[in-house]
């Protein structure tokens, strides 16, 4: 199980090129857990990707120390 601010590699089961992101939200749904992964896009902003724990499409890399928007 992942936590908010975990740094993850998101590969969507090899449908997309792997990307690094930060877990922004964790939500329990029925028998699964949904993660909202914030993926920074240079000069564009942030893309938000949803992934289910059952998909096995993300793996933990580490923990974010500095997170913008928090005080």
Which residue ranges define each predicted feature?
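Well-ordered beta-strand positions in beta-sheet-rich domains
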Residues: 7, 20-22, 46-50
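Short aromatic-glycine-enriched beta-strand elements
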Residues: 31-38
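Intrinsically disordered, low-complexity, charged/polar segments
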Residues: 38-71
């Amino acid at each position: 199980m992942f936590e908010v601010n975990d740094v993850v590699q998101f590969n969507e089961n090899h449908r997309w090129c792997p990307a690094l992101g930060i877990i922004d939200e964790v939500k329990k749904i029925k028998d699964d857990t949904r993660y909202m992964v914030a993926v920074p896009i240079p000069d564009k902003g942030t893309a938000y990707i949803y992934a289910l724990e059952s998909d096995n499409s993300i793996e933990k890399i580490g923990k974010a120390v500095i997170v913008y928007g928090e005080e």
